[in-house]
Amino acid sequence: MTILNHTLGFPRVGLKRELKKAQESYWAGNSTQEELLNVGRELRARHWQQQQQAGVDLVPVGDFAWYDHVLTTSLLLGNVPERHQNADGSIDIDTLFRIGRGRAPTGKPAAAAEMTKWFNTNYHYMVPEFQQGQQFKLGWTQLLDEVDEALALGHKIKPVLLGPITYLWLGKVKGEQFDRLSLLNDILPVYQQVLAELAKRGIEWVQIDEPALVLELPQEWLDAYQPAYQALQGQVKLLLTTYFDSIGHNIDTIRALPVQGLHVDVVAGHDDLAVLNKNLPKEWLLSLGVINGRNVWRADLSSWFERLQPLVNSRPLWLGSSCSLLHSPIDLNEETRLDAEVKSWFAFALQKCAELALLTQALNAPNDAKLAELAAYSAPIRARRSSSRVHNAQVEQRLAAITSQDIERQLPYEARAETQRKRFNLPAWPTTTIGSFPQTTEIRGLRLDFKQGRLDGKNYRTGISEHIKHAIAEQERLGLDVLVHGEAERNDMVEYFGEHLDGFVFTQNGWVQSYGSRCVKPPVIIGDISRPEAITVEWAKYAQSLTEKPVKGMLTGPVTILCWSFPREDVSRETIAKQIALALRDEVEDLEKAGIGIIQIDEPALREGLPLRRADWQAYLQWAVDAFKLNAAVAQNDTQIHTHMCYCEFNDIMDSIAALDADVITIETSRSDMELLESFEDFAYPNEIGPGVYDIHSPNVPSVEWIEALLRKAAQRIPAERLWVNPDCGLKTRGWPETRQALANMVLAAQRLREEQV
């Protein structure tokens, strides 16, 4: 039996981020809808061609999205929230953009749909909204149109469709509460119609994505799979597709389904292939996701060959990417500045397609020449294991020497708080900000000129110093109590630290989509992490010299740096996090020596690092909390440690939040009208809290009365003596006029509350 290969999806944005540029040009009114549609057509044609040329047997169609593939599925099903609908009930690309971003060149602006993380990745999807009794119909034929496009170009294709149960699982009920699973029978006819249309076009296989099957689903959701797929069978062959984790715990549900094939993620999952092979119906096709779609490392193809060869001829087999290549940069050949040795360790999306082709050829026709080719390809990644760029004996020794004392502050919070009160003598309702101030065109230009060599170090430092001086003066004038230096020198909260730590490398074009038109360029962790010299001390010390008020030192925490980077695969995530923590621990010590008495360690990614299955949470939370404490615990008792987190859900990890033992935690609460504080109240959270009093993502300026009302609401849940007053996030993306006005109102609200206590 000949083995075929396929990818589960390909990056959409284009090598030069063409899609992003076309979207933003269209949104700004600088180009027409037809020009935007043409860019999409060109990108799809290029990406299909590139995959085919790299040796992919079946190219995916339906993985392209104008904003997000879950949103595309909503439109396919005719699921458009009332506030975003066209008057005539039609659906067009502006409907899609209004759901995604709240506005489009046509139609009335309305609140965008909620956005959240796609499983445990750094990609975000638009959350489908469901109402009782809503109707579904085939409303947006993008998938069928793109299938026609690809067939006209002569490609062998495999359409991709998000499965009905995962789609419902990912959504939220709006308005009157009901069980959204009850909508299953209403959406299945649309799926049947789509599959019938694909069958008419001669499609043999459809990839139907059900990643919810890697989760610990409630029994009623598992029970829904059988009747759902009974309704969908018969028109085309269905490849039930899972990714991001193992499926062993749901294997009984899966193997009873009337489908013709199953895709499993062999990279992130830990399913025993021999057992899996034995447990599946013998006539099923088994697709093995062996090339990691979520990271940038070259595959050890020789190892995969040895592991897979026993399965050849046991059943129909395909080889695939572990998940969509959406999470990978596009082409390593564009990286002209990477060190040659380091570059030899990487593979981006196009290289991953070539890896699939090479491995497939070797398994289909194994001979000495093919095995030698696999060995030659795998040699760099094997040589990496002993590279001096990877291993640092001092870091490894220091990691091994960590004791329980290293992760505990000297005194408990109550005793520390007393010494901190004496040191800082802050008023009731102390005011502060989260860290960053507006990144003006001037600031960005200064950094770019320095990076590209148009500005020397001395003039760059002079320029940054002026911006810090301005930020301190603004805060003094506003009357804030604890100041920040404003982070003018920082491009990104992770990239900035990665650039100053050994063990990281950066790409020129390693862009991946985060959501909509937003792309990120994550650093790559290639080896043991250490800090060659102080990172933030110079600027913090300078800022503190300008004022009598305390200035916070600002660090990004170890778990966030890990989660927002491409990590190593040869050591555990725990090891990486603790190496970063040790490096930043030295930074805490140096900040203290420089006279900085308040140090903030941001961990916005602590919750998103959680494993998909709750059974694995405790182990993760244990080392994540330990990494934070290892970073912070070197601080003296009178040094106040702050942390900042922005999530919508604390209840289920409250124990771990408390275990961080930060003296002050600032959180994002403004959009939830302080409801998030219920978690802290119910838990009787012992330390100090700064609930965000206004939403920095909006240009709207909150009134003094509105902020005051929120603070009163907070004081009903948390004792006033433990409350801080702050925005809910950094102010980097805002302009100075609304920043000044909002902070002035915030300070005035705090002053009014203080006066009541006198």
UniProtKB/Swiss-Prot annotation:
Binding site for L-methionine: I434, G435, S436, E487, D602
Residues annotated as binding 5-methyltetrahydropteroyltri-L-glutamate: R17, E18, L19, K20, K117, R518, C519, W564, E608
Gene3D superfamilies recorded: 3.20.20.210
EC nos: 2.1.1.14
Enzyme class: transferase
CDD domains hit by this protein: CIMS_C_terminal_like, CIMS_N_terminal_like
Regions that span the bilayer: none
UniProt pathway: Amino-acid biosynthesis; L-methionine biosynthesis via de novo pathway; L-methionine from L-homocysteine (MetE route): step 1/1
UniProt-recorded name of the protein: 5-methyltetrahydropteroyltriglutamate--homocysteine methyltransferase
